[in-house]
Amino acid sequence: MAAESQLKRVIETLRRLGIEEVLKLERRDPQYRAVCNVVKRHGETVGSRLAMLNALISYRLTGKGEEHWEYFGKYFSQLEVIDLCRDFLKYIETSPFLKIGVEARKKRALKACDYVPNLEDLGLTLRQLSHIVGARREQKTLVFTIKILNYAYMCSRGVNRVLPFDIPIPVDYRVARLTWCAGLIDFPPEEALRRYEAVQKIWDAVARETGIPPLHLDTLLWLAGRAVLYGENLHGVPKEVIALFQWRGGCRPPSE
């Protein structure tokens, strides 16, 4: 079957790449840079809380995700935070990338704005956030939040840290589309969003075989997606990785 042969190809390529190269790529991630700017400005505790809140409301954006995070990083690196909850709600109202469902975003942020994440135990943080916001731990913005909190930890402590294998990949549209583009699923990206657990299962298998945990694979897909979908390899993703996600016709930018 095509999916099986493509899965083998993806595993072999990413196994050769390895976790150390992925960690290097993470330092180039606009999300990492934005989080790092905020952590450097406000310290680990306040910076990680702001990053956590932004991750929790990072859905249905009116623009590219990279630009949303760049705006967040610039906004809070220039702001003197006096009242974290109030200041974050003001940010939601101000951001040009959060125009859809403003009140729903504010409601979700209010649920978590007093919570201080445990950066030493992100598994515990995931369980607690799941309870606080009333969502399953596999839900995309929750697991994405753990990735962002790891960025806050790495920036604050000046270290790399590999995340656990039992936290699944967040399945947003970019991940869904690249999974389809790689030939790993035979249903379209829109359906993949609904069947996100099936997509997570595939990337869990890739993670086990390559030694790259799912949340680190997410960074790789996110950065590669910019090249695949928009023809902009801004972060130096290896060409052989980009090629994995151009297996299907229609998975190259219009200029190619």
From Swiss-Prot:
Gene3D superfamilies: Helix-hairpin-Helix base-excision DNA repair enzymes (C-terminal), Hypothetical protein, domain 2. Residues 125-184 are annotated as: Helix-hairpin-helix. Disulfide bonds: none annotated. Changing residue 140 to Q: Loss of activity. Keywords: DNA damage, DNA excision, DNA repair, Hydrolase, Lyase. Coiled coil: none annotated. Its EC number is 3.2.2.-, 4.2.99.18. It holds the Pfam family AGOG. GO terms for molecular function: class I DNA-(apurinic or apyrimidinic site) endonuclease activity; oxidized base lesion DNA N-glycosylase activity. One of its GO terms (biological process) is base-excision repair. 8-oxoguanine binds at residues 31, 58, 69, 144, 170, 218, 222. Highly thermostable. No decrease in activity was observed after heating 15 minutes at 80 degrees Celsius. InterPro entries: AGOG (IPR016544), AGOG-like (IPR015254), DNA_glycosylase (IPR011257), HhH_base_excis_C (IPR023170). It catalyses: 2'-deoxyribonucleotide-(2'-deoxyribose 5'-phosphate)-2'-deoxyribonucleotide-DNA = a 3'-end 2'-deoxyribonucleotide-(2,3-dehydro-2,3-deoxyribose 5'-phosphate)-DNA + a 5'-end 5'-phospho-2'-deoxyribonucleoside-DNA + H(+). The active site is at residues 140, 172. Belongs to the archaeal N-glycosylase/DNA lyase (AGOG) family. DNA repair enzyme that is part of the base excision repair (BER) pathway; protects from oxidative damage by removing the major product of DNA oxidation, 8-oxoguanine (GO), from single- and double-stranded DNA substrates. Contains two alpha-helical subdomains, with the 8-oxoguanine binding site located in a cleft at their interface. Contains a helix-hairpin-helix (HhH) structural motif and a Gly/Pro-rich sequence followed by a conserved Asp (HhH-GPD motif). This is N-glycosylase/DNA lyase. It comes from Pyrobaculum aerophilum (strain ATCC 51768 / DSM 7523 / JCM 9630 / CIP 104966 / NBRC 100827 / IM2). The lineage of its organism: Archaea, Thermoproteota, Thermoprotei, Thermoproteales, Thermoproteaceae.
